Amino acid sequence: MQLLHIDSAITGDQSVSRQLTAQTVEAWKASHPATQVSYLDLVADAPAHFTMDAMAPRTGQTDGLSEAQQRENAVSERLVSQFLAADVVVIGAPFYNFAIPTQLKAWIDRIAQPGRTFQYTANGPEGLAKGKTVIVASSRGGVYSTSEGGRAMEHQESYLQTVLGFFGVTDVRFVRAEGVAMGGDAKAQALAAAAQAIEAHVKAHAANQDRVSQAA
């Protein structure tokens, strides 16, 4: 089993989402010892934001690419191949200004490739990255999930659910720690709840794998 571990928080060791992704990966490895882990730090190894040079190789153009286009194509190819090779993807997604970090958005722009992660058909778009499990470690300074107003301001989890679904990923799970900037007690409670969610997601996947094996 191949697991891709992605972090995107700019705050390094102070990051809650990085703490949660590390806990998730360790729990997954404990439950699935044969798992092979690849790591992508989108702050240390950030893809450039999307440009025409990055887009050109994906519009059917194969000959006569400029040096800049070839460089950007190599970056996009590395990232999409890494994503497609993974059975499980763990994504650290902190809540920045009501959405996700620009580094994570730049990664999504690179892997959103027609013919690779999705295609358009006579019946509409079809995702091509089916069969993956994605666990998103979502961290928020405030609390946005418990009120209609808060949910209306949230373009982090909802966006990731949408774009991953567009890629064909139907098994998207969220480990959420919110209210982490609302005092020590609130942060401790949020981290405890997130730890329980990690355990539940890993156990649920292991139980489902056991059922599949028995059915086979």
Curated annotation (Swiss-Prot):
Entry binding sites for FMN: S15, V16, S17, S139, R140, G141, G142
**Record note on cofactor:** Binds 1 FMN per subunit.
* GO molecular function annotations of the record: electron transfer activity; FMN binding; oxidoreductase activity, acting on NAD(P)H as acceptor; oxidoreductase activity, acting on NAD(P)H, quinone or similar compound as acceptor
Q: Which UniProt keywords apply?
A: Flavoprotein, FMN, NAD, Oxidoreductase
Give the EC number(s) listed in the UniProt record: 1.6.5.-, 1.7.1.17
Q: Which InterPro entries match?
A: Flavodoxin_fold, Flavoprotein-like_sf, FMN-dep_NADH:Q_OxRdtase_AzoR1, NADH:quinone_OxRdtase_FMN_depd
The kind of enzyme this is, by top-level EC class, is oxidoreductase
Keyword Flavoprotein (UniProt): yes
Which cofactors, if any, are listed as required?
Answer: FMN
Cross-referenced SUPFAM superfamilies, in alphabetical order?
Flavoproteins (SSF52218)
What the entry lists under Gene3D superfamilies is as follows: 3.40.50.360
A Pfam family that this protein carries is Flavodoxin_2
Catalytic activity, per the record? 2 a quinone + NADH + H(+) = 2 a 1,4-benzosemiquinone + NAD(+); N,N-dimethyl-1,4-phenylenediamine + anthranilate + 2 NAD(+) = 2-(4-dimethylaminophenyl)diazenylbenzoate + 2 NADH + 2 H(+)
Q: How does it assemble?
A: Homodimer.
Q: Which PANTHER family match?
A: FMN-DEPENDENT NADH-AZOREDUCTASE 1, FMN-DEPENDENT NADH:QUINONE OXIDOREDUCTASE
Among HAMAP family, the record links this protein to: Azoreductase_type1 (MF_01216)
Stated role:
Quinone reductase that provides resistance to thiol-specific stress caused by electrophilic quinones.
The family note in this entry says:
Belongs to the azoreductase type 1 family.
Protein name as annotated:
FMN-dependent NADH:quinone oxidoreductase
Which source organism does the UniProt entry give? Acidovorax sp. (strain JS42)
